[in-house]
């Protein structure tokens, strides 16, 4: 019988967990690209509301989740932790495999966890419109939904190759009131520059971020919203890992391995960060970031300061990067086609606290198809990387005869990504 671990509605975490309070080292600060000195909050306030800037630099261990955000979380949280018994039987592994399913959210992924929070903080500071980028459309859909909830206009630049591959995402964003433009576009100076140099450019998250930032800085009523990478985004996503902790405690399990797909780091960070203090205190637990071999920022990138976008408009961030001009191949996992990585995750990799593994598209989709047939959930192409990672680890446990507890986050469903499976 399938084991599903559900928490009660009142058990939704009331605070986000801030790992910066517990790390034995300080992160390198974001730098002003003009002065190469730590960037001032005043400069960041052009694109972000001050409350999110404060969260970005906070070292407070727990940050209270505002009541209006909790009210919206309660629409779909807590999310279930499910034991993958059919997958275990198929693999004939002694490992116990659990997955945290974030696809039950209104837009089908983990992205509303931060979209709702960001929309709320922008709303209370008087912002009228949010502008953002999106790869596969999961983030754009989540922000469009959150904008509708809090009465904000939302403008989305969607990476062109994903815009063409995933038309249903555009329809979902439109349904929630979001206005979507394929990127690179004719709507911004940077977009026009890219198209003049390469009319067939497939786009990238770096380019789409540049276009969104250009719009944000030109309108005082508009702020920029980012779906991954930054500290405050990972902070909001820790509701995932905090719930996993409670759910595992309910059934008397302790994880040996935690996995998540990795593009910018929000889903992976949200999964593992609440467990980092356990590892720092000596517990034997592995964190595995699963990224596409076609965009291997953690496994093949350089650890250095780089821009978060292609035009060089963002602060310089210390991270693993393939270079701001890197244009990834047209893989189906559009949400993972990012040249950089979250500074928090990058530093954890650098310190040896997090492992990174790369997966090619064939292995990833083979894992996704097996999972769909056995567990009854069609995973998003991005999320399928975590499944591939879990299968690798389960096979290794079988070879070694170890009863390991493997936990991964299934960050979203793939019902709007079905063309990827053809």
Curated annotation (Swiss-Prot):
<dbReference type="GO" id="GO:0052684">
    <property type="term" value="F:L-serine hydro-lyase (adding indole, L-tryptophan-forming) activity"/>
</dbReference>
<keyword id="KW-0028">Amino-acid biosynthesis</keyword>
<dbReference type="GO" id="GO:0000162">
    <property type="term" value="P:L-tryptophan biosynthetic process"/>
</dbReference>
<keyword id="KW-0822">Tryptophan biosynthesis</keyword>
<dbReference type="InterPro" id="IPR006654">
    <property type="entry name" value="Trp_synth_beta"/>
</dbReference>
<comment type="function">
    <text>The beta subunit is responsible for the synthesis of L-tryptophan from indole and L-serine.</text>
</comment>
<comment type="similarity">
    <text>Belongs to the TrpB family.</text>
</comment>
<comment type="subunit">
    <text>Tetramer of two alpha and two beta chains.</text>
</comment>
<keyword id="KW-0456">Lyase</keyword>
<keyword id="KW-0057">Aromatic amino acid biosynthesis</keyword>
<dbReference type="GO" id="GO:0030170">
    <property type="term" value="F:pyridoxal phosphate binding"/>
</dbReference>
<dbReference type="InterPro" id="IPR001926">
    <property type="entry name" value="TrpB-like_PALP"/>
</dbReference>
<feature type="modified residue" description="N6-(pyridoxal phosphate)lysine">
    <location>
        <position position="111"/>
    </location>
</feature>
<comment type="pathway">
    <text>Amino-acid biosynthesis; L-tryptophan biosynthesis; L-tryptophan from chorismate: step 5/5.</text>
</comment>
<dbReference type="GO" id="GO:0004834">
    <property type="term" value="F:tryptophan synthase activity"/>
</dbReference>
<dbReference type="InterPro" id="IPR006316">
    <property type="entry name" value="Trp_synth_b-like"/>
</dbReference>
<dbReference type="InterPro" id="IPR006653">
    <property type="entry name" value="Trp_synth_b_CS"/>
</dbReference>
<dbReference type="Pfam" id="PF00291">
    <property type="entry name" value="PALP"/>
</dbReference>
<keyword id="KW-0663">Pyridoxal phosphate</keyword>
<dbReference type="InterPro" id="IPR036052">
    <property type="entry name" value="TrpB-like_PALP_sf"/>
</dbReference>
<protein>
    <recommendedName>
        <fullName>Tryptophan synthase beta chain 2</fullName>
        <ecNumber>4.2.1.20</ecNumber>
    </recommendedName>
</protein>
<dbReference type="InterPro" id="IPR023026">
    <property type="entry name" value="Trp_synth_beta/beta-like"/>
</dbReference>
